[in-house]
Amino acid sequence: MDSEELLYHVKITTHIASDIVAAEVDEDAMMLLEQAIIDSVGEANLRPPVHTPGGEDFHHYAVQRPALKTTMLGLGCGLEPGLHHPHMKFNHTRLITGVEILTRVLLAAIQKAQ
């Protein structure tokens, strides 16, 4: 901001109104999740990771607990018209798929830690 203040001869004051952090994906956690997806729904349903500049409140876990290995699961469930939209709808049977994937990744993480 200093350069803009000098360039335009103005004083710029900022205020951070919220604290949102970006995702920090751990490579080991991502590999465990990928294998859990393959084991649950098959390799044909595994998609490349999506890289997003967005923030999410769950990403604070990695900041507050740096030793925690984190990643994200994008569960294809036909969600529309958008997350948090008042008329959001999705295929509820995919929740069972999500539970299976997360159970497998947790069991694999426990086994790897032993």
Q: Which residues does each PLM region occupy?
A:
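Metal-dependent amide/peptide-bond hydrolase catalytic core
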Residues: M1-Q114
